[in-house]
Every structure is written in structure tokens, then in C-alpha cells.
């Protein structure tokens, strides 16, 4: 059985859209235990892997899938905003700039482990203070890395993106499905 170790509604929706059977069990791993030391890829890999390790001992016979997504702009890492003020700061940082989104993924069983990172770049439109405030009022940015959802209302903030759309959403679905085959997890036929 596949265990999705995530509280992310987006990751859940993506796996469901691929007709994968899974059990949703958010990992209780505290991400703040990992300090950012300048290497974004290593950072998201480590968090994804630690989330998986926290679940593997509870589900030793299953396959665990975990992920972590961050936004990097001007050398700064942006996770989920802590509050409205934090969301405003993040959106202002992203305003009229190109940034990078990194999603680290860990798929692990008792016999095997795959850890990888996918990235994409996103360019924001030039936003007014009112644009930012209006978007924050929707509440959409509050549980998203970088304080926006490319697949939601936040699409209006985006000028362009380069890379995999699902990576920006938080789970590089095509690559995850390929890797899951190695763990004998395949989509069910409808």
C-alpha cells in the first residue's frame, strides 16, 4: 500500500487524479529541525527524506511517499507564510521577478529508497499593493510555499513559468508515477 505522508490537499488531489490507491497519513516530522545551509536541493531532499523516515517505522511493510516544496528568490528560501504579514512580504519579494520552485521527493520502502528534486522557474507580473492585498484576502496563499497557488487564483499573478506545472504545485507527478513503478505501485484502471 502507498502511504502519502503529506497534509497537502494539492498532493492528495494530484495522486487521486492519477488513479493511485493510497492512504493519507501526514508526517509529524517537524521541518524546522532542518537548518538551511545554502544548498536548496539538499535542504528539500533532507526534509522529504526525514518526513518519510518518520513514517516508515509506523508502516514498515508499505511504500511511503513524501515531498517538500520551497521557493527561492534572491538567495532567500520561502516556505509557507506564518501569517498575513509574512505572506505580504513574500509576495512583495516575488513581485515582478523570476524565482525558482524546488520540490524534493522521497519514496521509500524497507528495501529501497528514491530521493530526487525537480525544479521550475516562475516569473511574477508587476503587482500593485492592492493586487497583493486582494489576493491575500482570498486566504489562498496561507498554506502554500511562497504564498501563492499557481493552479488557483494565484495564476493571475504569474507572467510565465518554465518547467513542470505539477512541480510548482508541490509534486512532480509524471516523475513520481515513473518512480512508483519501481515499487510496484501503478495506477488502477477505471
UniProtKB/Swiss-Prot annotation:
Keyword Hydrolase recorded: yes
Q: Name one GO molecular function term.
A: dTTP diphosphatase activity
Which Gene Ontology cellular component terms are annotated? cytoplasm
Pfam family for this entry, one: Maf
Q: State the active site.
A: 68
Q: Where is this site: Important for substrate specificity?
A: 10, 69, 151
Task: Name the HAMAP family on file.
Answer: Maf
The UniProt function text for this chain reads: Nucleoside triphosphate pyrophosphatase that hydrolyzes dTTP and UTP. May have a dual role in cell division arrest and in preventing the incorporation of modified nucleotides into cellular nucleic acids.
Protein name, per record: dTTP/UTP pyrophosphatase
* Organism lineage: Bacteria, Bacillati, Mycoplasmatota, Mollicutes, Acholeplasmatales
Amino acid at each position: 500500500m502507498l502511504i502519502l505522508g503529506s497534509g497537502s490537499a494539492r498532493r492528495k488531489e494530484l495522486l487521486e487524479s492519477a488513479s493511485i490507491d493510497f492512504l493519507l497519513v501526514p508526517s509529524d516530522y517537524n521541518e524546522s529541525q532542518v537548518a538551511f545551509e545554502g544548498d536548496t536541493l539538499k535542504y528539500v531532499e533532507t526534509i522529504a527524506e526525514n518526513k518519510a523516515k518518520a513514517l516508515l517505522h509506523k508502516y514498515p511493510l508499505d511504500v511511503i511517499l513524501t515531498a517538500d516544496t520551497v521557493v527561492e528568490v534572491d538567495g532567500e528560501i520561502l516556505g509557507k507564510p506564518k501569517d498575513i504579514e509574512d505572506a505580504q512580504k513574500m509576495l512583495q519579494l516575488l513581485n515582478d521577478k523570476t524565482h525558482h520552485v524546488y520540490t524534493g521527493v522521497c519514496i521509500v520502502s524497507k528495501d529501497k529508497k528514491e530521493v530526487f528534486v525537480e525544479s521550475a522557474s516562475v516569473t511574477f507580473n508587476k503587482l500593485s499593493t492592492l493586487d497583493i492585498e486582494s489576493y491575500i484576502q482570498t486566504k489562498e496563499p496561507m498554506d502554500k510555499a511562497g504564498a501563492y497557488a499557481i493552479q488557483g487564483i494565484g495564476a493571475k499573478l504569474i507572467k510565465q513559468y518554465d518547467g513542470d506545472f505539477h512541480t510548482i504545485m508541490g509534486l512532480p507527478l509524471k516523475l513520481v508515477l515513473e518512480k512508483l513503478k519501481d515499487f510496484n505501485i501503478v495506477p488502477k484502471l477505471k
